[in-house]
């Protein structure tokens, strides 16, 4: 199995700079082992990648680099205004590279995958449910709140975990 985890908007040094196995700057650690024990455990048990650079300078281009290894000319030129959309989550087909996504390559090679959040839209019902509503529903076992997910690109939907919430600050 390959597990591909995307950690956005944090530098290596901010999160894993306190790991002696890596080439980090401990003076830049903001979210060290005490705050991110799961990240540290994954790095210790599997793989620690330091000195790894990403060309994305914001979510819109970062997700394209992460998912396609390429940013289209259209996206680069839209950077200043995003008049059609902000395509960080698959909302603008003009931003897609003709070479396809990482999951297209997986499928071309006869392999399988499961998506837990990338290019996924989450629906929480009842609409307007906030974090405490969701938490209390879970704790009380009342099942009044439902969380569902589907691909923001339709071809991705069969591979999305339908109950795993993508990025949302409500949960």
Question: Positions of the model-derived regions?
Answer:
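N-terminal pro-sequences and low-complexity stem/linker regions of secreted or lumenal proteins
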Residues: 1-171
């Amino acid at each position: 199995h390959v597990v591909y985890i995307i950690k956005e908007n944090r530098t290596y040094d901010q999160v894993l700079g306190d790991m002696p196995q890596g080439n980090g700057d401990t003076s830049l650690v903001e979210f060290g082992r005490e705050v991110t024990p799961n990240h540290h455990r994954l790095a210790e048990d599997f793989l620690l990648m330091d000195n790894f650079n990403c060309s994305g300078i914001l979510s819109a281009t970062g997700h394209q680099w992460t998912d396609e290894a390429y940013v289209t000319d259209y996206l680069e030129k839209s950077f200043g205004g995003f008049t059609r959309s902000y395509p960080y989550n698959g909302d603008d087909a003009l931003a897609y590279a003709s070479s396809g996504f990482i999951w297209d390559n997986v499928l071309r090679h006869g392999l399988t995958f499961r998506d837990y959040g990338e290019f996924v839209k989450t629906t929480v019902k009842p609409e307007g449910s906030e974090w405490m509503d969701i938490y209390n529903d879970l704790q009380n076992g009342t099942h009044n709140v439902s969380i569902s997910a589907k691909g923001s690109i339709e071809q991705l939907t069969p591979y999305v975990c339908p109950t795993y919430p993508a990025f949302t600050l409500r949960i």
